[in-house]
């Protein structure tokens, strides 16, 4: 502020059509009391990926590891949907890579302001031939939704609305996640 310079993060997943439906379901109370939420990013990055740029895997230039770089968009989406957490307990480790300063694996347990319990798992040490999608799960007393990237594997509520079947058809989840195993597969809309 003093220098007259603004800084903002870009979190485009907040604005996807699928997210709009999920946010509306959360905000309108369709889940009832939400009990459990989860953000899971189980991706793979090769050692060559980290070696291809001097900034990758460093505290000074990358700002963090698997959570700050690869998982940040999914974590932001979870907070966008659920609000802030009152309590967080976490741990991190370097499990599959060498010559990097930051974590490649982390897990956290949290309690959100509304009382829901949550889990975040973020890693670039989970090998997969095709990659695992980034996942958001929200489960409550009246509904459950499992979001894979920007598609839904599960969209279920105790009371069906007139748009539920259309949402399931339009946003049906398919194959592996873009960028999960190949960072060049993330298109401009994911950044």
Residue ranges and their predicted role:
Residues 63-65, 95, 124, 182-187:
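Active-site rim elements
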Residues 69, 75-156:
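Contiguous beta-strand/loop segments that form the cofactor/metal-binding neighborhood of enzyme cores
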Residues 112, 134-137, 141-191:
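C-terminal glycine/acidic-rich active-site capping loop/insertion
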Residues 40-42, 58, 91, 123, ...:
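Generic beta-structure capping elements
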Residues 11-14, 124-126:
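Structured beta->alpha junctions
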Residues 1, 33-44, 70-73, 98-102, ...:
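Phosphate-binding glycine-rich loops and adjacent basic patches that engage nucleotide phosphates
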Residues 2-6, 115-117:
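A short helix->loop->beta-strand "cap" motif at the edges of active sites that frequently abuts
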Residues 5-6, 13-100:
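Predominantly a Rossmann-like dinucleotide-binding segment in NAD(P)-dependent oxidoreductases
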